[in-house]
């Protein structure tokens, strides 16, 4: 069993959870929640600027 990291916030994703998004060029992005998915794909937000993201630069 492999534990993946969220492409947006860096949280651990357990097997059977999360969203896998495949781009048209074949790369896969894994997200822990819909909140991360929408922030990254739809709104194209920078995770370093959001307070709730673990990847945030301090």
UniProtKB/Swiss-Prot annotation:
Q: What SUPFAM superfamilies does the record tag this protein with?
A: Glucocorticoid receptor-like (DNA-binding domain)
* Ribonucleoprotein in keyword set: yes
Any idea which UniProt keywords this protein has? Metal-binding, Ribonucleoprotein, Ribosomal protein, RNA-binding, rRNA-binding, Zinc, Zinc-finger
Which segments does the entry list as coiled coil? none
Q: Where are the zinc fingers (C4-type)?
A: 6-36
Reading the lineage from the top rank, the first entry is: Archaea
Q: Which GO terms describe its molecular function?
A: rRNA binding; structural constituent of ribosome; zinc ion binding
| InterPro entries membership | L24e/L24_sf, Ribosomal_eL24-rel_arc, Ribosomal_eL24-rel_N, Ribosomal_eL24_CS, TRASH_dom
Q: How does it assemble?
A: Part of the 50S ribosomal subunit. Forms a cluster with proteins L3 and L14.
Instruction: Provide the family line.
Output: Belongs to the eukaryotic ribosomal protein eL24 family.
Q: According to its UniProt entry, what is the function of this protein?
A: Binds to the 23S rRNA.
Q: What is this protein called?
A: Large ribosomal subunit protein eL24
Protein source organism? Pyrobaculum islandicum (strain DSM 4184 / JCM 9189 / GEO3)
